């Protein structure tokens, strides 16, 4: 049995959870999330907690046990607190700005790269070089942050590019010429 899956998930005061078989709907102050969990687990609400249990001792059920518990816990935390990822743009002339729901990134290409925010995601820019991606769905926030980073990943020689806040870039020495 999964050590992560065994622990029950407490439901905060302002969050309501409704279960319909494997379909889980979580409503909170930040929004609403719906997800259908894979087969192999059962989800029950006991008092003010959610309990996820495997349906059998098959390998697939045991594998999905901890996954499903974490997915539901992330949904509850997302609608109550929300998630955010911060990115930094490093390099001369590289900057970002928000126009409505669109993030416009100038990252050294001949044209600015535009990214439309999906539903439930917001972009914020500070000082033209710090981008914050925030929303209620942890998976969607992480995917959008990864897409922004993929526009211009940091290079190892000068460290220019788009990186996560706090990310260490492994630097390389340039080539040393013949002497």
Curated annotation (Swiss-Prot):
It holds the Pfam family Ribosomal_L6. GO terms for biological process: cytoplasmic translation. InterPro entries: Ribosomal_uL6-like, Ribosomal_uL6-like_a/b-dom_sf, Ribosomal_uL6_a/b-dom, Ribosomal_uL6_bac-type, Ribosomal_uL6_CS. Keywords: Ribonucleoprotein, Ribosomal protein, RNA-binding, rRNA-binding. SUPFAM superfamilies: Ribosomal protein L6. GO terms for molecular function: rRNA binding; structural constituent of ribosome. One of its GO terms (cellular component) is cytosolic large ribosomal subunit. This protein binds to the 23S rRNA, and is important in its secondary structure. It is located near the subunit interface in the base of the L7/L12 stalk, and near the tRNA binding site of the peptidyltransferase center. Part of the 50S ribosomal subunit. The lineage of its organism: Bacteria, Bacillati, Cyanobacteriota, Cyanophyceae, Synechococcales. Belongs to the universal ribosomal protein uL6 family. The gene is rplF. NCBIfam families: L6_bact. This is Large ribosomal subunit protein uL6. It comes from Synechococcus sp. (strain WH7803).
């Amino acid at each position: 049995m999964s050590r992560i899956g065994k622990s029950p998930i407490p439901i905060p005061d302002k969050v309501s959870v409704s279960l319909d078989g494997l379909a889980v709907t979580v409503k909170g102050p930040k929004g609403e999330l719906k997800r259908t969990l894979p087969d192999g687990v059962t989800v029950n609400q006991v008092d003010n907690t959610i309990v996820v249990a495997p349906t059998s001792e098959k390998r697939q059920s045991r594998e999905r046990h901890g996954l499903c518990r974490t997915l539901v816990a992330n949904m509850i935390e997302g609608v109550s607190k929300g998630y955010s990822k911060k990115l930094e743009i490093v390099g001369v002339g590289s900057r970002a700005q928000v126009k409505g729901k669109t993030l416009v990134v100038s990252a050294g290409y001949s044209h600015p790269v535009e990214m439309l925010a999906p539903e439930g995601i917001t972009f914020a820019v500070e000082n033209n070089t710090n981008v914050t991606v925030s929303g209620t769905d942890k998976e969607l926030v992480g995917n959008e942050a990864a897409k922004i980073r993929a526009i211009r990943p940091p290079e190892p020689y000068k460290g220019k590019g788009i990186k996560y806040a706090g990310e260490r870039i492994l630097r390389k020495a340039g080539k040393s010429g013949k002497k």
